[in-house]
Amino acid sequence: MEHIAQILAVIVTGTLVGVEFGVAAFTNPIVERLPDDAYWQARATGGRILGTVMPFWYITAAALMVGVAVLGHTPAAIAAVLVMGVVMVLTLTTLVPINNRVVAWAGAGGEAPSRELAHRWDRLHWLRVVLLSASFVGVALA
């Protein structure tokens, strides 16, 4: 059971890290080159779609990590769970509110948020990618 939980945790967390890295390294830089209206529409659409899917992915990854930590009692697994907790707090307290402002603007019209707001999200997202990578390493080493 422990091995199955660890394999699933590595797969789910690894793909999560890959998607988040892809958004940070490829998608957002491509979107950055668009004119303002297209830029905000792309950011809002991406935020809406990923904002719907990612909570389930994060919860699944965290639950699997907790399972690995409970079953294995290894320091690496416990560290992975703690780092994932930090990721989730960062996400819920800073990244989600910024994302919600971008998504809300696209539906309401009016003056667009500044690109600096999106750049702040991008910087915080890179921090999240680094933390997720550390969590992935922890669960992989458990």
Task: Spell out what each predicted region is.
Residues 2-14, 70-85:
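Interfacial segments of alpha-helical transmembrane regions
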Residues 139-142:
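Juxtamembrane boundary at the C-terminal end of a transmembrane helix
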Residues 95, 99-100, 125:
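Asparagine-centered polar/low-complexity signal
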Residues 2-9, 13-60, 98, 103-119:
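Interfacial loop at the N-terminal end of multi-pass membrane proteins
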Residues 88-94:
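Mid-bilayer segments of alpha-helical transmembrane spans in multi-pass integral membrane proteins
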Residues 48, 55, 78-81, 119-122, ...:
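Internal alpha-helical transmembrane segments of multi-pass membrane proteins, especially GPCRs
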Residues 54-69, 128-137:
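Core segments of transmembrane alpha-helices
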